[in-house]
A protein has these predicted regions:
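C-terminal binding/interaction regions
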Residues: 2-24, 29-103
Length: 103
């Protein structure tokens, strides 16, 4: 399930410009989707780098959401009450708007 979710997240990051209006195609260098398995949840971390002046936070957020939706889709037969919550930008370096780190 997690491997399929990683692949889905990578595809989502690469295709963000087709999903989000006014987003443009970026020259993505690397995409890393990882998961932390907790007792009551799965945490997804998406890390993306690109060769350009624009940030990749929308691509990372899109990758995270699609990865989690894939897990939901593949596990809904076990529990339809799963909740996808608290998606947020944790760290951004570079880009036109500068750096950001969540508190």
């Amino acid at each position: 399930v997690l491997t399929v979710a990683q692949i889905a997240g990578i595809q989502a990051a690469k295709n963000t410009s087709m999903l989000i209006p006014l987003a443009h195609q970026l020259n993505i260098i690397s995409i890393n989707i990882s998961f932390k398995i907790k007792e009551d949840r799965v945490e997804c971390i998406s890390e993306i780098t690109c060769d350009g002046k624009t940030g990749v936070e929308i691509e990372a957020l899109c990758a995270t959401q699609i990865s989690l939706l894939t897990i939901y889709d593949m596990c809904k037969y076990i529990d339809k009450s799963m909740i996808i919550s608290e998606t947020k930008l944790v760290l951004k370096e570079g880009g036109k708007s500068g750096s950001y780190k969540a508190e």
